[in-house]
A protein has these predicted regions:
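An alpha-helical, amphipathic repeat domain used for nucleic-acid recognition
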Residues: 1-193
Length: 193
């Protein structure tokens, strides 16, 4: 690429070449990622394979299959050291989503994206006593819709809109209509839901 047509101050940034992939580098990338974020085995596998693919794209002679084996070795080592634990990851994520009022469908989709099995997600939801009515109330409270609107007139005017919001969030129509029938709930009733 020629830079003659660019003034000195407007030259495009040159992309830095990817660093060489080695087993130790993959381990360091994995540790750095786990230091910042809890992860599932499958999710970390994707992160590490993405790095391998970036390096292989710039260096066609690089043996990707060997690097993929290094990735598997790193994952196995991290599991033995309990740095990676899908059960722990699932529990943390399910608890977080339940605390902010997310429906089961949303939780299942998000965790499936991270490589967690459906059976494991369902088991965790059952262990944590998932209650769709409670979750819908939490979401309604957070968004100040339905029974948490400030006055009765606003509730009547926005009933359909509020129902649509909860249904789009993933709650069943029966649960949503039940929530909409609840009388006004003042904001100071925090934990009585």
């Amino acid at each position: 690429m020629s830079y003659e047509n660019y003034p000195e101050t407007e030259q495009p940034k040159r992309k830095r070449p990817a660093k060489k992939i080695t087993p130790q580098r993959l381990k360091n990338i994995g540790l750095y990622s786990l230091k910042r974020f809890e992860s599932s085995v499958e999710n970390l596998r994707l992160v590490l394979q993405k790095r391998v693919n970036q390096y292989a794209k710039e260096n066609p002679e690089f043996n990707k299959q060997e690097a993929y084996q290094w990735v598997e070795n790193v994952l196995t080592e991290f599991e033995k050291l309990h740095y990676l634990d899908d059960d722990r990851f699932t529990e943390i994520k399910v608890r977080h989503y339940l605390s902010i009022g997310k429906p089961a469908r949303y939780i299942q989709n998000k965790l499936r994206e991270k490589g967690i099995a459906n059976a494991q997600i369902t088991e965790m939801l059952e262990d944590l006593d998932y209650n769709p009515r409670e979750m819908a109330l939490k979401l309604a409270k957070r968004k100040k819709i339905g029974p948490f609107r400030s006055d009765e007139e606003a509730r009547k005017l926005n009933r359909q809109k509020d129902m649509a919001t909860l249904i789009r969030a993933g709650f069943d129509y029966d649960v949503v209509s039940e929530i909409m029938e609840i009388d006004f709930i003042a904001d100071d009733k925090d934990d009585d839901l």
